[in-house]
């Protein structure tokens, strides 16, 4: 009898066969599932602490997605030859998995939970993110932890006006949509997508299609749990202290209501801090008088937060003004300024209410492209977008340094929004980096980065296909009543039920990201949200077009200029030289950057037009072919007894035989030539070995013949 209680479930899912198994590997984890999709294999494990740490007032969930290089038959680079810090792709995939799982843990569950997914084998055609999400969901389901899952997931492409389930990498490249959707049997929880200006109904159709198609994976997880699941934890939320809730409400409700009449964020935040401090102080007085221990501040803070949420949500559902005084459809005031930084290639300051982004675009050459060493192979990115949000943006102090997961995620969302509207490399040969510095934040800073990024690119002279704007939507849902909010504030994001970000042009959507905190979002609600988002997007696009009608026709004087020439691919080695000596000297002496592709396309970039012209001339000389009959101005390199070696072009020499210098007999070559002397010669012969024979007397004879023909006949 086997020592393993192994359970396997297999199902056909679109183009792919999927295998789930549990009970053999990682048995000491709370839950472990291996997912195999056509040789892309992941191991998802879950460990949950049996009790919460004392005083814990939030849910400590961590999700780590780790790609092992052995999965693709590779050995890692670097001195230690082992995997190092997570790549950007691993960080983004960890976030992708975290987002639909987090809302499904019950309220009040504060035990630490860690989800770790290892990629063990990779089929280059099958991305590992969807198997990883399915595996994490299945591992949680079999673990017995309190989890209101399982979650299913699907990737959807849109090719030839038809949806494609879980496309291969080649299909994704050919698609006008790359959308990932995750959800439960009844509801969608998360959407992440990049699109090529698709209409809202196509985007919504893709979400619905993906949700329908993921049900087979959810059914398979249910079957796996029935046969291989562990007993459910006997966990119950701590009973609510109704007396404490009533006392806190009595003390703070009126003051919290007054705080939310303040329209300025800083004033409101100050007032809320005062209310929190005063309430805690009063409760400590009560406890001292009664001879008891006061409730801890975390518990009181959670009660106050719940009161805040009820106040804000009821005001909005009752049709009252929002926190800052707007109605549900109004976008905050917008101010736009471009060309704000004098020596950058392109810049824009985009301000929407109390959210502000200073965005800078920089143009570079092919050598500046980012090289990505992915499991499926190395590739290059010509467009980079980086998002930074320092603590001062929210009036706080904090750590400044390498980007956190949130910053990496926001940067990728803004990049997705803009990338489909960039010109192709053939139309605009530069590599492009956009950096969004968030200088103020009160909600929707990633969408401010989209707007500011588009404006900075246009200021830099990048011929965008269209203006791109982004907007963040929110939702308040109570029973059958709901309100969709346009351009949400940070507080509305925290207190609401949905964060729904849409970016696009006047023609359609380029990026859609949705995170839902509750079950029960219907197709109709998403339809309303998309329609209202389009209305807000069009308003912002109008403001952007008024400020900047199109891309600058002139690049910044500080941006590199580029010229392209074509050379014979067999001559590439001549331009590069031994150990790179020739190209290194070229770039240093002309002040240019030179990139050479395998097909012989040479790109020369520099801020100096003179330097570019010189580099172009020298490359043309290096790659030029010596032709018989051509006349060259050469330099005598070396004198021999029987002639002279003359340099015609860089790296190309010829022999001027002693008999070809002048018509009369030459006794001593030193009487006619010196090393370093400039001499005009004609190519009279080349052979199959590349040897070149030159003549100076041929030019003398031609000159004599020409002068004789010009002499008038005698009478």
Swiss-Prot record:
Enzyme class: transferase
Domain S1 motif: residue ranges: 629-697
Main location: cytoplasm
SMART domains: KH, S1
Protein residues bound to Mg(2+): 493, 499
Superkingdom classification of source: Bacteria
Gene3D superfamilies for this protein: GHMP Kinase, N-terminal domain (3.30.230.70), K Homology domain, type 1 (3.30.1370.10), Nucleic acid-binding proteins (2.40.50.140)
Any one cellular-component term (Gene Ontology): cytosol
Keywords: Cytoplasm, Magnesium, Metal-binding, Nucleotidyltransferase, RNA-binding, Transferase
GO biological process: mRNA catabolic process; RNA processing
Gene Ontology MF terms in the entry: 3'-5'-RNA exonuclease activity; magnesium ion binding; polyribonucleotide nucleotidyltransferase activity; RNA binding
Enzyme Commission numbers on file: 2.7.7.8
Family annotation (PROSITE patterns): KH_TYPE_1, S1
Subcellular compartments: Cytoplasm
Catalytic activity as recorded in UniProt: RNA(n+1) + phosphate = RNA(n) + a ribonucleoside 5'-diphosphate
KH domain boundaries: 560-619
Cofactor: Mg(2+)
Function: Involved in mRNA degradation. Catalyzes the phosphorolysis of single-stranded polyribonucleotides processively in the 3'- to 5'-direction.
Family affiliation: Belongs to the polyribonucleotide nucleotidyltransferase family.
Protein name in the entry: Polyribonucleotide nucleotidyltransferase
Gene (name only): pnp
